[in-house]
């Protein structure tokens, strides 16, 4: 089954069961093709809540904004009707309730093994990387490339989902993924260590 079809079926099943569904997306170039395919699928999109797993703390129309990426490549065509929630520290606690557990979380991975905005220099942070930590969305100092301050979900909140899809694109990233199973210096190690049954990895060997 294709990744897009798996995401569609999970969202559609949740809508039929509870009347709404939640979809958490990542930025970067890896998911763009999936965004475009998914946005054209017939689904009651007005019943789908969409947010980001992380973002850079820049204006929404900035080229480095993940929100800008989502608006340009996903929230168009049929998916334009979806309910979009910018990522904020109080997203899962404020009154305009965002559905949890999340139905689908779509993640990418960097060449340093980071996912979301959880980077190697943060591994010793209990709140960021421990699966038993309290659910949290928090701001970070400047990280990554581009070197900018960020906002991100922590690992325990990401794991609070019915399905996680990890996209890994390119030979160098695939090598990092293979190493991460036994290398606890790589952030992605902690995601892989805690993966559950509905954890999909799409490897794109380019």
Residues of each region from the PLM?
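Glycine-rich N-terminal segment of FAD-binding domains in flavoprotein oxidoreductases
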Residues: 17-38
């Amino acid at each position: 089954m294709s990744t897009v079809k798996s995401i569609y079926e999970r969202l559609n099943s949740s809508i039929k069961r509870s009347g709404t569904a939640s979809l958490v997306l990542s930025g970067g170039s890896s998911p763009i093709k999936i965004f475009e395919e998914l946005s054209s699928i017939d689904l009651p999109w007005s019943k789908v809540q969409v947010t980001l797993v992380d973002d850079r703390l820049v204006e929404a129309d900035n080229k480095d904004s993940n929100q800008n990426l989502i608006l340009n490549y996903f929230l168009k065509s049929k998916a334009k009707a979806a309910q979009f929630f910018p990522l904020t520290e109080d997203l899962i606690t404020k009154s305009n309730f965002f559905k949890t557990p999340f139905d689908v979380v779509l993640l990418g991975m960097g060449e340093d093994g980071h996912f979301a905005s959880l980077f190697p220099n943060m591994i010793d942070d209990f709140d960021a990387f421990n699966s038993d930590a309290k659910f949290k969305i928090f701001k970070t100092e400047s990280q990554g490339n581009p070197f900018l301050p960020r906002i991100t979900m922590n690992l325990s909140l990401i794991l609070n989902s019915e399905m996680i899809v990890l996209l890994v694109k390119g030979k160098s990233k695939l090598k990092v993924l293979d190493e991460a199973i036994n290398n606890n210096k790589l952030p992605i190690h902690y995601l892989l260590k805690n993966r559950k049954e509905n954890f999909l990895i799409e490897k794109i060997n380019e």
